[in-house]
């Protein structure tokens, strides 16, 4: 009976040891998988936060772009209206100019010709409006870029 009891105790000890090793192995695996899961959950939260931030920034940039595009279109329309008004004679393009010719004294009766005031040539007038439009475009682009840098590149 001693021998049987000794064999049973040894079998139980080996069984207990095997169960302990298996439990320890699966426990280590569970801890490893939990750590991996927690790491992936943090990465997912960070990715979601990044996506949300990017979406907010995209909406802000789209609103900024729409604002400055609208302002640029309004400025161009105003420039075209001014160009049409000058061409139709409703408005005059005033420049600070002086006549470079000298006044000649006539020996006969003095008089004044029916001369018009100084005026830009048609090509110079067209060039003026082209330069004005380009200046407006550059100003609006610069304002938009500065606003973008100040708001988005912080």
From Swiss-Prot:
It holds the Pfam family Phage_lysis. This is Spanin, inner membrane subunit. Homodimer; disulfide-linked. Interacts (via C-terminus) with the spanin outer lipoprotein subunit (via C-terminus). Part of the spanin complex which spans the entire periplasmic space. The spanin complex is composed of one homodimer of the i-spanin linked by intermolecular disulfide bonds involving two Cys residues and one homodimer of the o-spanin covalently linked by an intermolecular disulfide bond involving one Cys. One of its GO terms (biological process) is viral release from host cell by cytolysis. It comes from the Viruses. It comes from Escherichia phage 933W (Bacteriophage 933W). The keyword Ribonucleoprotein does not apply. Residues 1-3 are cytoplasmic. Keywords: Coiled coil, Cytolysis, Disulfide bond, Host cell inner membrane, Host cell lysis by virus, Host cell membrane, Host membrane, Membrane, Signal-anchor, Transmembrane, Transmembrane helix, Viral release from host cell. Component of the spanin complex that disrupts the host outer membrane and participates in cell lysis during virus exit. The spanin complex conducts the final step in host lysis by disrupting the outer membrane after holin and endolysin have permeabilized the inner membrane and degraded the host peptidoglycans. Host outer membrane disruption is due to local fusion between the inner and outer membrane performed by the spanin complex. The gene is Rz. It is a single-pass type II membrane protein.
């Amino acid at each position: 009976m001693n021998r049987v009891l000794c064999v049973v105790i040894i079998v139980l000890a080996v069984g207990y040891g095997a169960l302990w090793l298996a439990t320890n192995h699966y426990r280590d695996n569970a801890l490893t998988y939990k750590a991996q899961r927690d790491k992936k959950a943090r990465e997912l939260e960070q990715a979601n936060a990044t996506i949300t931030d990017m979406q907010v920034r995209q909406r802000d940039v789209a609103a900024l772009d729409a604002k400055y595009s609208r302002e640029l279109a309004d400025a161009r329309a105003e420039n075209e209206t001014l160009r049409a008004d000058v061409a139709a004679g409703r408005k005059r393009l005033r420049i600070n100019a002086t006549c470079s010719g000298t006044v000649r004294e006539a020996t006969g009766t003095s008089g004044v010709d029916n001369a018009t005031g100084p005026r830009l040539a048609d090509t110079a007038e067209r060039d003026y409006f082209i330069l004005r439009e380009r200046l407006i475009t550059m100003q609006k682009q610069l304002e938009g870029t500065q606003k973008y840098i100040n708001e988005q590149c912080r």
